Amino acid sequence: MSYPFELGGETLWDAGYHSGQLYASLARGAAEFLELPSGLTPNDQGGCDVETELFRAFVEGLDGMYSSTKNQVLHGLAHGLLVTSLVLLERAEGEITLTHRYAATLLEEKAVLARAMG
């Protein structure tokens, strides 16, 4: 059983059911924390539709929080969500510019995770 993330009928990430559910839940929680829409909408196929511009703004907000916090716990909590979101955003043909001190590491981790995400 899977949890697909789709854009215009194209599957961007055919996540495993539990991985997809957890990611969507974490994104909802982070969006609420950031006071931004996540750009992910549950669909009838048991996954989520991605609205690229809203999702891009969410990822940008998440990255802004991640790159500016000095709180190691908050930084750690946001890390996996951000890397996964960067992969999904790239697949949705959206992008943000990473210019902070974590940029190179995040881009390397994004490339590794993208392969694992299929």
Predicted regions and their residues:
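Acidic (Asp/Glu-rich) sequence patches and key acidic residues
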Residues: 1-118
